[in-house]
Amino acid sequence: VLGRVIDRFTDDGLTPVLAVELEFYLVSPRRARDGSILPARPAGGRTPTGVEVYGLRELDDFRPFFDDLYAACDAQGLPLESAISEFAPGQFELTLRHKPDALRACDDAIMYKRLVKAIAQRHGVEATFMAKPFADQAGSGMHVHVSVNDGDGQNIFASAAPEGAAALGHAIGGMIGSIGDGFALFAPHANSFRRFRANSYAPVAPTWGVNNRTVSFRVPAGPPAS
């Protein structure tokens, strides 16, 4: 299906540019007495607690895991970039570099997900990409960064005008119109819907906005080079 869509872009002289971000938790292979999931304990023995978003210590606690993950991704040609700790204990996100090959970018995301799970097992923990593994903690999502380049390599969505580029408006309108059908792919499980709640950085309506993390389709603001 994606291949046919890309062919239609190619026929119009356009190239989709794509990157995928996947949030995940590192959790203990043991379970609590009630069967609930427990956060992973790093080699140093410190149990993560509280919101530790963007914390460096949280990354350093699991440094052996991340070192092996980066090495494995490099060996398989996966363009892994920055790593951050997220909004809950043991939750992380690593970014894959943008590619002017949407099909390969999606394949990279699938391969990366398998690698994360395999490397986690090697370090005695488990990685879960479940949308809502903890009822009282942040959910995990997948962010897809999309732009479209013309034949000269220029982003047709970019514009310095306050109202933005017309092509961007059409793209957003099309995605909003198809978001209902998209749930079959983007929220395929009962657990997926546990993440959709107000004030949780998960969208609860077919909306869009500029630099607004609560909407379904976010237009990031940035310098012209971005």
Regions found by a protein language model. Give the residues of each.
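Glycine-rich, acidic/polar active-site loops that bind/position phosphate-bearing ligands
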Residues: 1-226
